[in-house]
């Protein structure tokens, strides 16, 4: 699986820490960083769009910004993207099981690195349940 990851300045430090952790935790996943390149102030939408535009059926994304609202809103403008703003492991689980989320949006100012790692682990290891949820997910794209 390929993973695209991106953040704005508020999520930069957590993004870098998650990349280092994921290389060890998920060695078979190919990680491509779509930016930002530093903690210098930048526009979240640029990096949310870069991740969303890169997605396909065999990939997932992770986006980080201060609240994760901006990156989620921007990413969800793209057809086929289901970016889920998560702040607990349980919400990340439900986002995968019920919504087939393909982007995990993390509010870097409101969760610890340990919570972010738990959500990422769940995001990769939790399958979509399908069934009654599949017909609901099919209704998302206009």
Regions found by a protein language model. Name each.
Residues 63-109:
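Mid-chain, well-packed structural core segment of small domains
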Residues 29-41:
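A short beta-strand-loop structural module common to alpha/beta enzyme folds
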Residues 46-67:
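Short, structured active-site "lid" loops
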Residues 13-24:
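Short, solvent-exposed amphipathic alpha-helices that sit
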